[in-house]
Amino acid sequence: MIKFKFIRSISFISFFISSVCFSSMHVKGDEEPSHIAESARASNRGFGYPKLSDVSFSSRRFRPENQKDPHDTFSTLPRFFSTRLDWVYDYGNQENIIGRTNALGLNYNGAISSILPDEIGGFVRIRGRDRSVNGDLSVLAHLPSKPAIGDVWSKQYIKIASNHVREMIRLGADGIQVDDPGMNYAEAVYREGGYGDTSNEKFSLWLKQNSSKKQRRNWSIDLDIDEFSYREWVHSKGGKDHIPPDLKELHEKFLLEGLLQFYETLRKVAAEANGGVQVPFSCNTSSNVVWKDYSKWADFGMAETRMNNISPMKIWRWVCSPERKIGKGHVLCPPRYDALTPPANIVPFTRSCIATTYAMGSLMIVPWDVWQKNNGGPRYFGTAEEYADIYGFVRAIPELFEGYEAVFCRGGGIPTSIYKFNKSPVVLQGNHDGVVAVVRCIPKSESAPVVIHLVDWNKPQSFTLIFDQTQFFFGNKMAFNLFTPTAYDQNLHEKIYAESIFNQLALVKELTPERHPDGKLRLLIPPLNPWGIIKVSLK
């Protein structure tokens, strides 16, 4: 009878590996054995990107915020076995938060945005602000307080942002996350902003240097007029939709130039505050998880996601598709829903998202205090009972995450032909409609174990994994062990955290393959909840 056992040590696992092995394949015809790790390529996810076995926790504000707040940042953080505290805005309480985070040995990444207050810990937003074409302050309209957006050409806002960055680094922050990274450039491109007082003044001189007199005559613009105001000129024409496209393009180019200079300044400020050592900057790459001209400067992305815009295929495209144009990594936020109350499937759906994101070589932030509803609805706070086993599983077996790269994926609509294998290394069979398989290897290693992540997005059922051993370890002897998360138990989890014995957060099960006449191996996989990892080891 097969029994589940806690993982005690590498030597203990080695005992299992040595107990299940298979002789080398007899190669038919001109088919030569190979090793799938030869196809793996190392990824550069960006300066400062988290470890692949990290657990990212986010508390947008320090909690409890008041006596009525039932949530507590630092009592909740260890329940998910967190290694990082990311994307934190609480400027007035930074010394307390960063100090406590550092004392726990965790990585801390503070956040800045387009709506920084004039003073650290303050609430007034007047200095150095962007304006719309009619002269009103540009604001983030989806937030109840309608905070005013900064003008990146303004020395006042540059100073405000620099002060925030400098203070975070001084207190011990390890990195900076930038929310709404498009600032007033994005306001000009997508909304009605981009006409802050400083930008408006500087654009007249910039336009004179970057356009010809003939162009300006065609636009009916006279830059020699004292106190020419581009904002007023556009307003007189009826708004940006009524100005020549080439002029609009130049205005956006000017704002983008200022934005990139703004971030270059903040990088220098952070490095100076850090003793001359560069500090990683990430930025919000939106719920579409895309790199824009205003975000490509960042070292890596921290992206929001939505339930209606996330799937195995989307995660694959975002984090591990061989055809990604920009190789920088993304840390994903858990999927957001747009109703006032969580949908019935929020927990299983989110668990599958978390597992798939890790399986494909990225991280998903713990679903706790991570986004605000546009309509002012309550924030979502997932519990340890719902999600801690998934994150604990990652902490239990970091050696099966670090250094590994996706070399083959299937299921969830992922096109296997993109991987250029003559034959699929693994095939799913049986009740596998919702199963996603990700084969991961350490590039070029002939001896490191291969891992096969399996995530079931449907109601868990047993299914079969067909394994072509001619493509693994040159057809040599192998052993198979299935790792799954230890079920959540509050007392056990608290004990494990207190004693740092994280390997007890995974269970291991020996798998005995069935050899078929075609030479391939069949592995019967038990129901997953929703995640399992097969470790394929060379004997």
Predicted features, each with a name:
Residues 468-505:
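Solvent-exposed beta-hairpin/edge-strand motifs
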Residues 141-300, 304-307:
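Polysaccharide-binding and catalytic clefts of secreted carbohydrate-active enzymes
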Residues 360-364, 368-430:
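Catalytic cores of secreted or luminal carbohydrate-active enzymes
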Residues 27-86:
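Boundary/entry segment of secreted carbohydrate-active catalytic domains
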Residues 64-171, 182-192, 199-202, 245:
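Acidic/aromatic-lined carbohydrate-recognition and catalytic surfaces
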Residues 421-476, 483-485, 532:
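Carbohydrate-binding surface patches
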